[in-house]
Amino acid sequence: VTSQVPILTAPTAAGKTALALALSERFPLEVVAADAFTVYRGLDLGTAKPTPAERRAAPHHLLDVVDVTQTYDVARYVRQAEAAIADVLARGRVPLVVGGTGFYLSGLVRGLPLTPPADPAVRAEVEADLAARGLDALLAEVERASPAEARRLERNPRRVVRALEVHRRTGRFPGEFGSTVPAFAYRVFAFTWPWPELEARIAARVGQMLAGGWPQEAAWLAAQVPPDGDPRPTVWQALGYREALAVHRGELSPQAAGERITLATRQYAKRQLTWTRTQLGAPPSSPQAAVGALGAWLGRWPSGEER
């Protein structure tokens, strides 16, 4: 039985990459990214993807694996991440899963739901309902059948459509189908900052990204994948890209865009913290405590600690 694989998770802008790189100076680490948008080639600035220099400092896996015109989902992520973890372990090094996409982390830790494959006809029907009646009406439909499922979907249109597509076909929601068995056991190390500090970090990073070429990156993305396609393209669900595009087009000032993106990012960070506590069972500590605990645990790796 392989020892537990460590996961380092924190909300957006908390400094996960910096912390992982600091640990890589002390341990033979390779980073396995767990982020729904750094998988896309060309989405660099707006996703705060590790820079070439950071990627030279420690090997990174699961970055730049698909083109923006391609679809990518949690099942594909889990397959590729498990293959990367196995490869790192086979070379006698330590895989450190680093990221904040809760859905991806849950797929690794808890397995993938054994839901039926998509049915394009039913999905088209649900998407037509979404366009005609709006998200709230669809969420109300879920709520009537299962309040817990409605909460779990977090107002994410893509997940609401998927849940209703499955429910209308089977009478069950995706979470009711059970899951695959995870390939590895994991140990989650979660951290965050006091909320005012995290808010300040988010605002500062959004400002830097908008000044550093994000609007141009959003314009490049729009040329590859029109933002208003139907169904809504997955890549355009990445936070802030629509606002960055509006800056490029002269429709929003950088300041107004920054305020909107900062607000949306703060809301996302709160959802990430909730997911970490409720779905991963890992109450976040301070960055200092997390790096101390993870460093001590890595010092005992591969035995680590038994659960």
List where the protein language model places each region.
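Phosphate/pyrophosphate-binding catalytic cores of soluble transferases and nucleic-acid-acting enzymes
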Residues: 1-307
